[in-house]
Amino acid sequence: MAIYKSLTEADLLAFSTGLIAGVDEVGRGPLVGDVVTAAVILDPNKPISGLNDSKKLSEKRREALFDEICDKALCYHVGRASPAEIDELNILHATMLAMQRAVAGLNIAPELVLVDGNRSPIFVAHNGAELTSHSIIKGDGLIASISAASIIAKVTRDREMDVLDAAYPQYGFAKHKGYPTKAHFEAIAEHGVFDQYRKSFKPVKALLGL
């Protein structure tokens, strides 16, 4: 597996003329909830305008692109790792597991997997063969399929935080999305933690005296 600091869509021809799956994650930093990943294979005959790193898009634009990706992509799948798995494996290995689940869930086998960041797990096709994969630093702003994956993962996790907010409104999940903000720390200090918290993360461990 190679690591690339810069890559354009045209460069992909050097890797593959077949189907390419882009993979990205969201939710490594929060204290609560799953780490969520997505794998997306775009349809080259149905281009999507405005794809970019999900963090650089407004919520309204992300939501609109989410719907367009779901409608136009050849296939996509969301993979995740639970707080219990994060605590057992650590956040890095849990993220790699979630990425593997995202790719394994695609109903079309890609010939190449491109992952945002500086590392990638081993991906295996349904027939047991290892898939070719490359990691691309800042790939979510360079490669359309990775951008699409970042949007699918981000919108999926944000919606899940909104659901959690409805169940536990005293924590303010709709605003901070589970990240370690001052308001979140204050809510934890007042109300404690529940089973969706990542007990291996230092602020949660400190509160629990672990």
Swiss-Prot record:
Q: Which reaction does it catalyse?
A: Endonucleolytic cleavage to 5'-phosphomonoester
Q: Which cofactor does it need?
A: Mn(2+); Mg(2+)
The residues the record assigns to binding a divalent metal cation are: D24, E25, D116
Q: Which Cys-Cys disulfides exist here?
A: none
GO terms in the biological process aspect are: DNA replication, removal of RNA primer; mismatch repair
- Extract the Pfam families matched here: RNase_HII (PF01351)
What is the annotated localization of this protein? Cytoplasm
What EC number(s) are associated with this protein in UniProt?
3.1.26.4
Give residue ranges for domain RNase H type-2. Answer: 18-210
* The record's free-text note on cofactor binding: Manganese or magnesium. Binds 1 divalent metal ion per monomer in the absence of substrate. May bind a second metal ion after substrate binding.
The answer, when asked if Metal-binding is one of the entry's keywords, is yes
Instruction: State any single GO MF term.
Output: RNA-DNA hybrid ribonuclease activity
* Principal subcellular localisation of the protein: cytoplasm
Q: Which keywords does UniProt give here?
A: Cytoplasm, Endonuclease, Hydrolase, Manganese, Metal-binding, Nuclease
One CC-aspect GO term = ribonuclease H2 complex
Biological function: Endonuclease that specifically degrades the RNA of RNA-DNA hybrids.
Q: Which family does it belong to?
A: Belongs to the RNase HII family.
What protein am I looking at? Ribonuclease HII
Name of encoding gene: rnhB
